[in-house]
Amino acid sequence: MRKKNDEDFILAYFEENEILGMVGFIRETGQKFRHKGHVWGVFVYPDHRRKGIANQLMLKLIDKARKIEGLQKIKLSANRTSIASVELYGKLGFKPYGTERNAAQYDGEILDEVYMDLQL
Protein backbone atom coordinates (compact mmCIF):
# COMPACT_ATOMS: atom_id res chain seq x y z
CA MET A 1 0.00 0.00 0.00
CA ARG A 2 1.24 3.47 -0.88
CA LYS A 3 1.71 6.02 1.89
CA LYS A 4 -0.52 9.08 1.51
CA ASN A 5 1.27 12.03 -0.03
CA ASP A 6 -0.15 15.56 0.25
CA GLU A 7 1.34 16.40 -3.16
CA ASP A 8 -0.88 13.92 -5.02
CA PHE A 9 -4.10 15.36 -6.44
CA ILE A 10 -7.05 14.92 -8.77
CA LEU A 11 -8.48 17.77 -10.85
CA ALA A 12 -11.99 17.73 -12.26
CA TYR A 13 -13.73 19.90 -14.84
CA PHE A 14 -17.33 20.78 -13.98
CA GLU A 15 -20.11 22.43 -15.93
CA GLU A 16 -23.43 23.10 -14.20
CA ASN A 17 -22.47 20.75 -11.32
CA GLU A 18 -21.74 17.93 -13.77
CA ILE A 19 -18.26 16.46 -14.02
CA LEU A 20 -17.12 16.40 -17.66
CA GLY A 21 -13.49 15.40 -17.24
CA MET A 22 -10.70 14.64 -14.80
CA VAL A 23 -6.96 14.05 -14.45
CA GLY A 24 -4.81 12.75 -11.62
CA PHE A 25 -1.24 13.40 -10.48
CA ILE A 26 0.94 11.29 -8.22
CA ARG A 27 4.45 12.10 -7.04
CA GLU A 28 7.08 9.40 -6.68
CA THR A 29 7.82 8.68 -3.03
CA GLY A 30 11.24 7.02 -3.07
CA GLN A 31 14.19 9.25 -2.18
CA LYS A 32 15.87 8.60 -5.54
CA PHE A 33 12.69 9.27 -7.50
CA ARG A 34 10.96 12.20 -5.77
CA HIS A 35 11.98 14.52 -8.59
CA LYS A 36 9.35 12.80 -10.79
CA GLY A 37 5.57 12.79 -10.91
CA HIS A 38 3.06 10.89 -13.02
CA VAL A 39 -0.11 11.95 -14.79
CA TRP A 40 -2.85 9.33 -14.67
CA GLY A 41 -6.52 8.95 -15.49
CA VAL A 42 -6.90 11.69 -18.09
CA PHE A 43 -10.54 11.39 -19.12
CA VAL A 44 -13.20 13.53 -20.78
CA TYR A 45 -16.66 12.15 -21.49
CA PRO A 46 -17.04 11.44 -25.23
CA ASP A 47 -19.82 14.02 -25.76
CA HIS A 48 -17.50 16.74 -24.44
CA ARG A 49 -14.27 15.88 -26.24
CA ARG A 50 -12.60 18.31 -28.65
CA LYS A 51 -13.76 21.29 -26.58
CA GLY A 52 -10.42 22.00 -24.88
CA ILE A 53 -11.33 20.40 -21.55
CA ALA A 54 -8.34 18.04 -21.46
CA ASN A 55 -6.09 20.95 -22.42
CA GLN A 56 -7.43 23.08 -19.55
CA LEU A 57 -7.05 20.22 -17.08
CA MET A 58 -3.49 19.52 -18.19
CA LEU A 59 -2.50 23.21 -18.06
CA LYS A 60 -3.81 23.40 -14.48
CA LEU A 61 -2.01 20.16 -13.58
CA ILE A 62 1.30 21.45 -15.00
CA ASP A 63 0.89 24.77 -13.17
CA LYS A 64 0.16 22.99 -9.89
CA ALA A 65 3.06 20.55 -10.39
CA ARG A 66 5.51 23.40 -11.04
CA LYS A 67 4.77 24.67 -7.53
CA ILE A 68 5.82 21.39 -5.89
CA GLU A 69 9.26 21.84 -4.37
CA GLY A 70 11.91 19.58 -5.89
CA LEU A 71 9.72 18.26 -8.71
CA GLN A 72 11.68 18.30 -11.98
CA LYS A 73 9.76 16.08 -14.36
CA ILE A 74 6.22 14.93 -15.16
CA LYS A 75 5.72 11.62 -16.95
CA LEU A 76 2.70 10.15 -18.70
CA SER A 77 1.78 7.53 -21.23
CA ALA A 78 -0.86 7.37 -23.92
CA ASN A 79 -2.14 4.72 -26.25
CA ARG A 80 -0.38 5.14 -29.58
CA THR A 81 -3.73 5.04 -31.42
CA SER A 82 -5.02 7.98 -29.35
CA ILE A 83 -3.61 10.53 -31.79
CA ALA A 84 -5.48 13.47 -30.24
CA SER A 85 -4.00 12.71 -26.80
CA VAL A 86 -0.44 12.30 -28.08
CA GLU A 87 -0.75 15.54 -30.08
CA LEU A 88 -2.18 17.44 -27.09
CA TYR A 89 0.65 16.31 -24.84
CA GLY A 90 3.17 17.30 -27.51
CA LYS A 91 1.66 20.79 -27.77
CA LEU A 92 1.96 21.09 -23.99
CA GLY A 93 5.69 20.39 -24.22
CA PHE A 94 5.82 16.67 -23.44
CA LYS A 95 8.47 14.80 -25.41
CA PRO A 96 8.26 11.10 -26.30
CA TYR A 97 11.06 8.97 -24.89
CA GLY A 98 9.91 5.44 -25.63
CA THR A 99 7.21 3.04 -26.73
CA GLU A 100 6.09 -0.13 -25.01
CA ARG A 101 4.92 -2.59 -27.60
CA ASN A 102 1.96 -4.78 -26.68
CA ALA A 103 1.39 -2.73 -23.52
CA ALA A 104 -2.34 -3.36 -23.29
CA GLN A 105 -5.18 -5.34 -24.79
CA TYR A 106 -8.64 -3.96 -25.40
CA ASP A 107 -11.46 -5.76 -27.20
CA GLY A 108 -8.97 -8.32 -28.47
CA GLU A 109 -6.69 -5.66 -29.95
CA ILE A 110 -3.04 -5.36 -28.86
CA LEU A 111 -2.09 -1.74 -28.15
CA ASP A 112 1.24 0.07 -27.89
CA GLU A 113 1.84 2.76 -25.26
CA VAL A 114 3.85 5.95 -25.95
CA TYR A 115 5.81 7.28 -22.95
CA MET A 116 6.36 11.04 -22.70
CA ASP A 117 7.81 13.47 -20.19
CA LEU A 118 7.90 17.18 -19.51
CA GLN A 119 10.97 18.74 -17.88
CA LEU A 120 9.86 21.41 -15.44
Locate the predicted segments by residue:
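Conserved N-terminal glycine/acidic-rich loop preference
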Residues: 13, 33-40, 57, 84-96, ...
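Short amphipathic helical patch at the helix-1/turn junction of helix-turn-helix
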Residues: 44, 79-80
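Conserved G/P- and acidic residue-centered "switch" motifs that form tight phosphate/ATP-binding loops
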Residues: 52
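Conserved GNAT acetyl-CoA-binding A-motif
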Residues: 58, 65-78
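Conserved catalytic-core motifs of GNAT/GCN5-like acyltransferases
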Residues: 75-78, 90-111
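Acetyl-CoA-dependent GNAT
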Residues: 1-47, 58-60, 64, 119
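Terminal substrate-recognition subdomain of acyl/acetyltransferases
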Residues: 109-120
